[in-house]
């Protein structure tokens, strides 16, 4: 079976693993998935991530919990293959009045909404995390 939207698959695996109180989740790796995982780690939503360098590289994400509850309360895909969403730096929305983040793919790499606004770059709005 071919996968049409690997980013949605990644977000769904994270959401399902946290609902099942799993310590870690594994998935096929790509450069974009690693960049998203790096942003999630920098913002404190996951413990860590690692990429195995076998024949098919696997991305393993160590999930984070606080007081027995998942740190990620909501993780949602915004731009999808059937309907891409692009925003200028001034149009990038604030998630939960700054308590959550939007992950944006820009010409300067994958970054949070705050970083994109401060650097004055827009791009594709990949997902929101709260």
From Swiss-Prot:
GO MF entry, a single one: rRNA binding
Gene Ontology terms describing biological process: translation
NCBIfam families found in the cross-reference section: PRK00136.1 (NF001109)
Role noted for this protein: One of the primary rRNA binding proteins, it binds directly to 16S rRNA central domain where it helps coordinate assembly of the platform of the 30S subunit.
HAMAP family for the chain: Ribosomal_uS8_B (MF_01302_B)
Assembly notes: Part of the 30S ribosomal subunit. Contacts proteins S5 and S12.
UniProt-recorded name of the protein: Small ribosomal subunit protein uS8
Taxonomic source organism: Neisseria gonorrhoeae (strain ATCC 700825 / FA 1090)
């Amino acid at each position: 079976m071919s996968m049409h939207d690997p980013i949605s698959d990644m977000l769904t695996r994270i959401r399902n693993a946290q609902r099942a109180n799993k310590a870690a989740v594994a998935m096929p790796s790509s450069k974009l998935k690693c960049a998203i995982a790096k942003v999630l780690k920098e913002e404190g939503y996951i413990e860590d991530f690692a990429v195995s360098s076998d024949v098919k590289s696997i991305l393993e994400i160590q999930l984070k919990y606080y007081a027995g509850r998942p740190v990620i309360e909501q993780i949602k895909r915004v731009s999808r293959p059937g309907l891409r969403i692009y925003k200028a730096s001034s149009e990038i929305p604030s998630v939960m009045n700054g308590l959550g983040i939007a992950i944006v793919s820009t010409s300067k790499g994958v970054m949070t909404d705050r970083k994109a606004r401060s650097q004055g770059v827009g791009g594709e709005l990949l997902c929101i995390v709260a």
